[in-house]
């Protein structure tokens, strides 16, 4: 997350301007594969705030931007934080299903979002295309999160989430 209130709640320090300044030249040099992670379900991060963190990380154009889902592992500090009203799958890996600011329907949509983003951006199969689109999203009127949300909605509308993985190239 790049949200200070979220980071404070989980006792993490993040100097975002310093991170940007440090990571951007590494990515631009092209000699090192940069993989960044973003977690769904952290405290105080609703759908829109998650989108802002996504846009912040996407603006760096990492080689991979992995979207994960908070897991409430037994004994973890975040599992004991009752004020965030976590609802999690009772079976391992104990992924969150909803939080105090992120309802189930948003978590479910973000699962589909993650799948679409993984297939199209992280797969690197469309690296040239998304290199161009990425620049438009960073500097244009539509932000990356909105673009990939729209792409996810279209994906769902067309029923592509039901397509067998081996048949995905036919879409």
Feature map (PLM): residue ranges:
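Conserved non-cysteine loop/helix-boundary elements of the Radical SAM core domain that shape
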Residues: 1-91, 97-102
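Intrinsically disordered, low-complexity regions
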Residues: 4, 110, 165-168
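Aromatic-residue detector
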Residues: 26, 68, 89-95, 108-112, ...
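C-terminal accessory region of radical SAM enzymes
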Residues: 92-128
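Radical SAM enzyme core and accessory elements
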Residues: 115-171
């Amino acid at each position: 997350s790049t949200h200070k209130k979220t980071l404070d709640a989980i006792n993490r320090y993040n100097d975002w301007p310093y991170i940007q300044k440090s990571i951007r030249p590494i990515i631009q040099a092209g000699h090192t594969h940069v993989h960044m992670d973003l977690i769904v379900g952290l405290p105080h991060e609703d759908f829109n705030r998650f989108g802002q963190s996504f846009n912040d990380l996407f603006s760096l154009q990492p080689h991979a931007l992995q979207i994960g889902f908070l897991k409430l592992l037994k004994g973890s500090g975040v599992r004991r934080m009752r004020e965030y009203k976590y609802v999690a799958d009772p079976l391992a890996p104990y992924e969150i299903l909803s939080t105090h600011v992120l309802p189930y329907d948003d978590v479910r949509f973000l699962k589909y979002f993650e799948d679409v983003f993984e297939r199209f951006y992280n797969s690197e199969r469309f690296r040239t295309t998304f290199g161009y689109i990425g620049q438009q999203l960073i500097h244009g009127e539509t932000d990356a999160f909105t673009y990939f949300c729209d792409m996810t909605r279209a994906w769902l509308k067309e029923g592509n989430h039901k397509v067998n993985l081996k048949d995905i190239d036919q879409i």
